[in-house]
Amino acid sequence: MKNINPTQTSAWQALQNHFDAMKEVTLAELFAKDADRFGKFSATFNDQMLVDYSKNRITEETLSKLLDLAKETDLAGAIKSMFSGEKINRTEDRAVLHVALRNRSNTPILVDGKDVMPEVNAVLEKMKKFSEAIISGEWKGYTGKPITDVVNIGIGGSDLGPFMVTEALRPYKNHLNMHFVSNVDGTHIAEVLKKVNPESTLFLVASKTFTTQETMTNAHSARDWFLKTAGDEKHVAKHFAALSTNAKAVGEFGIDTANMFEFWDWVGGRYSLWSAIGLSIILSVGYDNFVELLSGAHEMDKHFSTTPFEKNLPVLLALIGIWYNNFFGAETEAILPYDQYMHRFAAYFQQGNMESNGKYVDRNGNAVDYQTGPIIWGEPGTNGQHAFYQLIHQGTKLVPCDFIAPAITHNPLSDHHQKLLSNFFAQTEALAFGKSRDVVEQEFRDQGKDPAQLENVVPFKVFEGNRPTNSILLREITPFSLGALIALYEHKIFTQGAILNIFTFDQWGVELGKQLANRILPELGDNKEIASHDSSTNGLINRYKAWRG
């Protein structure tokens, strides 16, 4: 994987010049010039997904220059490096192989000369057997009752991915009730424990090291709660399993290491739902549906690693994102799923993107002088329309948006889905083409009103348009199509990081706060006044101590 400053390439300079010619061009003009624009700037994946990127402020020349940037920064080499098991996470000396976790072809993938696939398959088989015992009721709790509730205790990648997927795939869920606890705020675990019975609850403790502060604090609280009823510590083994690699700590906790599911240092947390961290997904929707999820992602992996860039969906979406981020100065991207089951999708890729590409140091260790990762946010439609779309339509900030929707709903109630999709289609049209002053005035005339008398209102009803969007239409949200969609975004993020010359797979930015919290925690153990920090931190700690009593 080469270290190339993108701004020093001839392609970047060409894009800068091209931007000067494009910045005033409107989407209305682009569509008026080309009746086949949709045909040229859209593509279908596996007859399951349509990606329409025609409502972007791009031309064929724009894409050509962006593709030149991908070539000049050796994106092809970066993709090959990742898929071949090279240690592209150099700051932690690790390979990056979430693609191996869903490698349904089972072709060998080597790390340090060793094929990782036998171990991947062994853990999958172990999860299959365990999940089947739980789901079937064969596995019994300490009083002989089958498991009814599963509580996943994890944080970050050990929580966001499994929670997002189990919510997205709720139509496929079985009888088990799923709960997720992440926050070290005791309220989170306390509220979940109110809902479950210790005799029929299984806790999954998801921590690679089995030392993560938030996760282990919650796990010990769950264990204490359980033992208040169960009494004997030997019963812990019937009600707790671990997603970890620290067999010693797992055993000391009281978990049978036969119920410890391993993953490897080449699995990054925010790319780990495909690993043992996905056990909660299997328990929710069954092993076969989990395999379908893996299969959908694997198909997207094949597309990403083998398709020429000009037809490569993750690459195209990544390049369009760079176009807005680095040339138009757009600071954010909104992810807007028109499906209530997908309500955690934006939050998941908020971590996926911002923890991956929120870096100001390049792969050479130098501070960058260009923009890297964007701010990611979003909510499901149509809720967002009644909240923040006002700013997207008429605000002063450029917010490129991804609209996502299924053609087929899992809940065909009355005409709900047609109304939902009519909004989906209308919003991208409105954002692209807006409403001119002439149209506003004509609407007033059609209502029998005199535009001249309404001069003070007309400007506020004008929509400039020219707001860019991608539309991703899925045939239906299934385990397969969801797997493909997640992998699409994963590879988009990797592509942008590769081109922008940053390390996408470390996350040193989360460390400093943790270090300082560990330093401050002992200071909160008494009521002595603190003077060891800056005046603000001292003031906050001392007021906290005064108020807590």
Curated annotation (Swiss-Prot):
Q: Which family does it belong to?
A: Belongs to the GPI family.
For the keyword Protease, the answer is: no
Got any disulfides in this one, which pairs?
A: none
Organism listed in the record: Cronobacter sakazakii (strain ATCC BAA-894) (Enterobacter sakazakii)
Q: Which GO terms describe its molecular function?
A: carbohydrate derivative binding; glucose-6-phosphate isomerase activity; monosaccharide binding
Q: One matching Pfam family, short form?
A: PGI
Q: What class of enzyme is it?
A: isomerase
Active-site residues per Swiss-Prot or TrEMBL entry: 355 (proton donor), 386, 514
Q: Which GO terms describe its biological process?
A: gluconeogenesis; glucose 6-phosphate metabolic process; glycolytic process
What protein name is recorded for this chain? Glucose-6-phosphate isomerase
